[in-house]
């Protein structure tokens, strides 16, 4: 009788332990993204985030990806994460602005001088600092900040553009972004909101004459077939994030958080590697068919940056001036700091 009772008790203990372990092994983080396989974000999820989390956790955690807006896109993904429908999501830093201003600093025009500077400063301190604020204030934590397409570059179908004065009178396609609209206007062109899907035909027909789009996307859309003059001014960095709902993040154990951050770091490195290759391939193809790909001198760049001061003034209150100043000074952009301070933007 005693042996039978002991065996039953032992079986119960084993059963409880087994099901507890099984439950622990089934921590699945559902991810919503606009990224797709064959592009840097989708490929980095597939090649780095998923396997890195599985390896770090020994199979106790996994990512369930839903690519190409199959569940949601950017802001909507963030809302679904808040509702507990998904855990992880990707977004541009600009669209994160619907949840709070913590990442607005990444979208300031000319905040970064180069892709290398953007990665270095983000990796060393800026991303961690701003993401901590996001976790505290906005209901989300960004696990990785990275580029998706690098910088926007000017392309037009009419003539060489080397300084802002060369844009005068040209009809320049813009998105609905007030920052982009202001930049184009301050540079002297006529801002013309125009749908992305119609941009190729718009440039071809002359309805619009120029555009300001990240170079690999110009290549994807084959805009270099109808716009032959390019100006490498940079300016607007295409910041993106991998984020998680704060409540779900805080519910993870310390060990689970460690596993997740290990995987997010691997994802950040991979997406940066893939993005750099995507940018280079796109720009190489554009340069091969362009009539001119012009790189302005530093004196000319100061004129392009001057056109961004109004956007910085409009953005006051969404970023910490001392933090922005530190970012600029770490890149040797003392002249731009002086321009911004003189205008009262810093």
Residue ranges, per PLM feature:
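Absolute protein N-terminus
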Residues: 1, 25-26
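Bacterial N-terminal signal peptides that target proteins for export
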Residues: 2-14
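Sec/Tat signal peptide C-region and signal peptidase I cleavage site
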Residues: 18-25
């Amino acid at each position: 009788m005693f042996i039978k009772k002991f065996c039953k008790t032992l079986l119960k203990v084993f059963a409880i332990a087994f099901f507890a372990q099984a439950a622990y092994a089934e921590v699945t983080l559902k991810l919503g993204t606009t990224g797709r396989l064959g592009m840097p974000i989708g490929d980095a999820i597939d090649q780095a985030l998923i396997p890195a989390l599985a390896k770090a956790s020994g199979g106790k955690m996994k990512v369930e990806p839903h690519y190409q807006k199959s569940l949601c896109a950017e802001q909507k993904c963030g809302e679904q994460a808040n509702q507990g429908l998904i855990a992880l999501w990707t977004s541009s830093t600009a669209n994160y602005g619907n949840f709070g201003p913590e990442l607005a600093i990444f979208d300031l025009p000319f905040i970064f001088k180069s892709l290398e500077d953007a990665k270095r400063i983000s990796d060393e301190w800026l991303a961690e600092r701003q993401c901590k604020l996001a976790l505290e204030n906005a209901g989300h934590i960004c696990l990785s900040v990275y580029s998706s397409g690098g910088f926007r570059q000017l392309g037009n179908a009419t003539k060489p553009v080397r300084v802002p004065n060369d844009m005068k009178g040209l009809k320049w396609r813009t998105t609905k972004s007030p920052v982009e609209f202001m930049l184009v206007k301050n540079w002297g062109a006529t801002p013309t909101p125009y749908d992305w899907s119609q941009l190729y035909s718009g440039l071809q027909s002359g309805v619009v004459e120029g555009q300001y789009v990240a170079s690999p996307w110009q290549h994807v859309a084959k805009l270099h077939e109808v716009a032959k003059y390019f100006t490498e001014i940079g300016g607007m960095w295409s910041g993106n994030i991998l984020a998680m709902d704060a409540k779900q993040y805080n519910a993870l154990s310390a060990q689970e958080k460690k596993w997740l951050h290990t995987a997010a770091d691997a994802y950040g490195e991979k997406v940066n590697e893939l993005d750099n290759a995507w940018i280079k391939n796109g720009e190489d193809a554009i340069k091969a068919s362009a009539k001119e790909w012009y790189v302005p001198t530093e004196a000319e760049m100061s004129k392009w940056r001057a056109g961004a001061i109004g956007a910085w003034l409009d953005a006051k209150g969404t970023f910490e001036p001392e933090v922005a100043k530190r970012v600029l000074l770490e890149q040797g952009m003392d002249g731009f700091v002086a321009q911004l301070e003189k205008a009262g933007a810093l």
